Amino acid sequence: MRDPAPSDTQKKRVIVGMSGGVDSSVSAVLLMEQGYEVEGLFMKNWEEDDGTEYCTAMDDLADAQAVCDKIGIKLHTANFAAEYWDNVFEHFLAEYKAGRTPNPDILCNREIKFKAFLDYAMMLGADLIATGHYVRRRDIDGRTELLKGLDPNKDQSYFLHAVGGEQIAKTLFPVGELEKPEVRKIAEKHGLATAKKKDSTGICFIGERRFSDFLKQYLPAQPGEIKTTDGEVIGRHHGLMYHTIGQRQGLGIGGLKDAGEEPWYVLVKDLDNNVLIVGQGNEHPLLFSGALLASEIYWVNPIDLSTPRRLTAKVRYRQGDQPCTLEKTATGYRATFDDPQRAVTPGQSVVFYDGEICLGGGVIEVAEAWSNPA
């Protein structure tokens, strides 16, 4: 059920995080139709230092302003670049330096959109904030739950798993009940400049640059050997940080004599020896894990893990729900899967669900090899 409109005597002030995209634009429209007093806020989270707008921040601000002008609401702007650098980007670099593959969007949601933005909006006198995320919330028994968005192709609960229930309780998600085509229809109906705007993809601060070109600006590359599982050296890599488990493209080791035609995949990143271990075939056994370890989990609301609990999990965005058993260990958490999981990647997030409820998640520390119980 959608959030009810406030009564006339309790007209609530909502500040919408306006990204310059269609989802936040339509969120503002829907809230106005529901009777809220609506304002917008555009966040600048990255400072370009070379004169090139890789993040298209100026274009996005112009689109956000055009939408706010069209629907007749005020647009605030705020610069959270310092907070982003300290709380998101430095962690991003540290993870890559340690050989892991982080997801900065998850940290950005926790530290910027649902912390810095939320605090700033409250300072401006807002009762609530709103975003264009495809998730839903439910208030039940004195707590606020985070639910999957109704559009399975757009559900973004994976990215919001580290946001606490107290923050979710102060947030409205107007498009979480809708499917994307309906959102675009609403934007077209209201003549919004963002109606046909492409969805943003990738990491904002990298933009259109090649990832390797961006990363080498901040971290020195450490070239090393590429080896097969038998220890044969078949090439060289430019740095382990440029590769991730399960990667196929960009290895530069095709056409080897006696190797067969099957493509090569990254199986292991040997950090101690700076070696990339590869193997052939999409179904290579070393690509599959049966369990994973996480040292810390952020729960939307506290849950009881005094005994192992049956849940489902995702180890990547848009993955289907994977049945698993989650248990607390002496050093963290262990999730054991019913079925083998391909390319479980340290540094990425595992997110746990109970049906449509997103319970929380944490960073994958270790992926344990799959051993067939049969």
From Swiss-Prot:
It is found in: Cytoplasm. Its main location: cytoplasm. This is tRNA-specific 2-thiouridylase MnmA. The active site is at 108 (nucleophile), 204 (cysteine persulfide intermediate). GO terms for biological process: tRNA wobble position uridine thiolation. Belongs to the MnmA/TRMU family. Residues 154-156, 316-317 are annotated as: Interaction with tRNA. Disulfide bonds join 108-204. Catalyzes the 2-thiolation of uridine at the wobble position (U34) of tRNA, leading to the formation of s(2)U34. The record marks 133, 348 as: Interaction with tRNA. It comes from the Bacteria. ATP binds at residues 17-24, 43, 132. HAMAP family: tRNA_thiouridyl_MnmA (MF_00144). It is an enzyme of class 2 (transferase). GO terms for cellular component: cytoplasm. Residues 103-105 are annotated as: Interaction with target base in tRNA. Its EC number is 2.8.1.13. Keywords: ATP-binding, Cytoplasm, Disulfide bond, Nucleotide-binding, RNA-binding, Transferase, tRNA processing, tRNA-binding. GO terms for molecular function: ATP binding; tRNA binding; tRNA-uridine 2-sulfurtransferase activity. The gene is mnmA. The keyword Hydrolase does not apply. It catalyses: S-sulfanyl-L-cysteinyl-[protein] + uridine(34) in tRNA + AH2 + ATP = 2-thiouridine(34) in tRNA + L-cysteinyl-[protein] + A + AMP + diphosphate + H(+).
